[in-house]
Amino acid sequence: VTCMDVISKKQFDEFSLPYIKKLIDGTEKIMGSRPGAHICGKTSPIWSDLADAGLFSFSIDNCEDLEVAKREVGDRMRFAGNVPPIEVMKDGSIDDVIEACKDCLRKCGDNPKGYILNTGCQLPIGTPKRNVEAFIYAARKYGRGAQLGKLPKGILEG
């Protein structure tokens, strides 16, 4: 599996999608539930394919727009991610982290299939502990009262 920064949609359809479908079906058969996944980079051209393949959730890299994802396939797939791991989590301030978390919750917290606040990719080495703690603080405060299809109470109450 790879992003549209590396291969074309046609190549994805030929070389990745059939195997993604097999992995999803196999995981569901063995584990009893469908998996989630993350693909680094640009993925918007394949969101519908991933939803059609039966992916339970998809972690969106921070280079993509959560509002667009929600609008295009939010009724078919749960999303996670999108807080920038380098610009915000590693290099940003505590306030930057809190604002990025709030922004993601505002954009996708009411996704019909759900949203999991997370970073757009894994945290880089050297990410300050204070920023991880700020992320946890923001998730607890602003993600409070989360329900499918509704903005969390923490966002609504500010």
Could you say what each language-model-derived stretch is?
Residues 1-158:
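Active-site loop segments of alpha/beta catalytic cores
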